[in-house]
UniProtKB/Swiss-Prot annotation:
The gene is cmk. Keywords: ATP-binding, Cytoplasm, Kinase, Nucleotide-binding, Transferase. Its EC number is 2.7.4.25. It comes from Neisseria meningitidis serogroup A / serotype 4A (strain DSM 15465 / Z2491). This is Cytidylate kinase. It comes from the Bacteria. It is found in: Cytoplasm. Pfam families: Cytidylate_kin. It catalyses: CMP + ATP = CDP + ADP; dCMP + ATP = dCDP + ADP. PANTHER family: CYTIDYLATE KINASE, CYTIDYLATE KINASE/PANTOATE-BETA-ALANINE LIGASE. One of its GO terms (biological process) is pyrimidine nucleotide metabolic process.
Length: 218
């Protein structure tokens, strides 16, 4: 089996996999792909076009012609900067909804694979190691306790780690976990050949170092 110059990092929402993947890519000089961003973009694009998230035929057509551009650290949709707009909890739930549609996943699959060049790639998502890059050199399932993930998300958006707003974040994370684990197509789960990395008690720096140490031993 020919291995691909890819580190695939999968895991649940708000586990820190995006931050870790981006830093690992920078350390190695590899490109970085946030596969979840494509699903979030699809959900946002469908919303803007007035298409329901469960309308498989129309959402899959929108996914095929997604007018998205990744420029440095910004993400553009039809020329509009939506870098922050796709990170809301509502769009996250939309992404989870469209990700359950087989035709949408098929529409986005080749687009994700096209990000791989000779330079190398670090990709994060929910099925990057199992479906998108099954021949990745290193596969990691990165996770953390749901309350820890909720606390990290709360700090990220500047709200206290208690009260109704925090409970809503925790509830949203747990609801998305449930949806991702139980979807019929590419459900979220650790693959047999993926290394488990629980970051509940680790800093970002410690997590990045762990991933790099593992990769250098591949």
């Amino acid at each position: 089996m020919n291995r691909q110059k890819v580190i695939a990092i999968d895991g649940p929402g708000a586990s820190g996999k995006g931050t870790v993947a981006a830093r690992v890519a920078a350390a190695l000089g590899y490109d970085y792909l946030d596969t979840g961003a494509l699903y979030r973009l699809t959900a946002l694009y469908a919303q803007k076009q007035g298409v329901g998230w469960h309308d498989e035929e129309n959402v899959s057509e929108l996914a095929k012609k997604l007018p998205a551009v990744f420029s440095d650290s910004r993400i553009l949709l039809g020329g509009e900067d939506v870098s922050d707009g796709i990170r809301t909890e509502a769009i996250g739930m939309g992404a989870s909804a469209v990700a359950q549609l087989p035709k949408v996943r098929a529409s986005l699959l080749q687009r994700q694979r096209d990000f791989l060049t000779e330079k190398g790639l670090v990709a994060d998502g929910r099925d990057t190691g199992s479906v998108v890059f099954p021949q990745a050199e290193l596969k990691i399932f990165l996770t953390a306790e749901s309350k820890i993930r909720a606390e990290r998300r709360a700090k990220q958006i500047g709200i206290p780690c208690e009260g109704l707003a925090f409970e809503r974040i925790l509830s949203d994370i747990e609801a998305r976990d449930e949806a991702d684990r139980n979807r019929k197509v590419a459900p979220l789960k650790q693959q047999p050949d993926a290394l488990l990395l629980d970051t509940s008690r680790l800093t970002i720096e410690e997590t990045v170092k762990k991933v790099l140490d593992w990769y250098r031993k591949v």
